[in-house]
A protein has these predicted regions:
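Short, charged N-terminal helix-start/capping segments
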Residues: 12, 58-64, 144-148
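Membrane-embedded alpha-helical segments in integral membrane proteins
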Residues: 19-24, 56-63, 111
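Membrane-embedded alpha-helical hairpins and interfacial helices in multi-pass inner-membrane proteins
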Residues: 28-33, 41, 68-159
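Interfacial segments of multi-pass membrane proteins
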Residues: 47-49, 61-67
Length: 159
């Protein structure tokens, strides 16, 4: 295995671990109908490079193992993250990516809450959408600041 492949595996492992651990640490606000999963900020990495998508998806899967929603969140939540990341990679713009993340998570997690807890779909999809958009728009501004650091972008993110 060459050095670049090892670096990619390690980078994805670190991203996945960070996402999972930090989400579990903020679990009171990271799960449920009204959620502010602050770790979602890092899914915006997918706007810059598809190489981060496996780590982000696995991190979400690991975090959802601790979810009170159980198997529903493991399946639906992880699928939402994967679909959102793919959409973000396609648009390559952090602000459009924030909207994509909000819509995808709102719809899929809203459906999850409807199926698992029989909560009203539309209002819960809206709550998840709003929480996700707040977090991701803050993240988009943070990433716009990071874009000014050419060394960071060229060496670690865009490479």
């Amino acid at each position: 295995m060459n050095n670049k492949k090892v670096q990619l595996i390690v980078m994805n492992a670190m991203i996945g671990a960070a996402y999972a651990v930090l989400t579990i640490l903020i679990s009171p606000i990271a799960y449920g109908a009204v959620q502010m999963r602050l770790t979602e900020i890092i899914v915006l990495l997918a706007c810059y490079n598809k190489k981060f998508i496996p780590g982000l998806t696995i991190g979400c899967l690991l975090a959802n193992l601790a979810s009170p929603m159980g198997l529903y969140d493991i399946c639906f939540g992880t699928a939402a993250t994967l679909i959102a990341c793919l959409g973000m990679y396609y648009v390559k713009n952090v602000f459009a990516g924030a909207l994509i993340g909000g819509v995808v998570n709102g719809l899929i997690v809203g459906l999850e809450l409807y199926l698992a807890l029989e909560l009203p779909f539309m209002i819960n999809a809206f709550y998840v959408f709003i929480g996700e958009c707040i977090v991701l728009i803050i993240g988009a501004f943070l990433f716009k600041c990071l874009e000014k650091n050419k060394t960071l972008m060229d060496k670690y993110i865009l490479e």
